[in-house]
């Protein structure tokens, strides 16, 4: 089921719909489904989306590792957006 999330990241309001969310004792796994095949270069908007979801969930689950996946439906591939990519996406949002 889709999970709605809302909160603030670096003082900015954020709201979204997570396609699938799995929480266990050590991890929080976020999966977002994208139609089509995996592109050769993932759009920056998708990195930002997953970075913002992860930042919100890290506030809720500070003791768990947040893992973010893009699931491409056409070719059934999964792409993990790792912490470094998420951090870079958040840094690109910072003013100045």
What residue spans do the PLM features occupy?
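Structural signature of nuclease core domains in nucleic-acid processing machines
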Residues: 1-96
């Amino acid at each position: 089921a889709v999970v709605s999330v809302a909160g603030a990241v670096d003082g900015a309001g954020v709201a979204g719909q997570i396609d699938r969310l799995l929480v266990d004792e050590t991890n929080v796994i976020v999966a977002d489904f994208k139609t089509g095949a995996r592109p050769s270069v993932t759009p920056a908007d998708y990195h930002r989306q997953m970075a913002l979801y992860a930042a919100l969930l890290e506030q809720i689950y500070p003791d768990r590792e947040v893992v973010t996946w893009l699931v491409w439906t056409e070719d059934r591939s999964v792409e993990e957006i790792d912490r470094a990519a998420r951090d870079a996406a958040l840094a690109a949002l910072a003013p100045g």
